């Protein structure tokens, strides 16, 4: 399942981050790495962007990025 499929207040453990290059590095720099727990806080009305909580920080990411983050639902 991808992070983009989680509903608000659902959490998932990152299994892997797909993609390559600058986009993947950016996600890693944001603390989104394997075995990290991510919680979806809320979604914009049309589903993009998604507000998430990672390592105690709240941030927004695009749905396109969220769909590259493979998670295991917690």
Residue ranges and their predicted role:
Residues 17-20:
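A structural micro-motif recognizing beta-strand termini
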Residues 23-26:
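Short alpha-helix capping/helix-loop boundary micro-motifs
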Residues 1-2:
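Absolute protein N-terminus
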Residues 44-74:
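C-terminal structural segments of small proteins and small subunits
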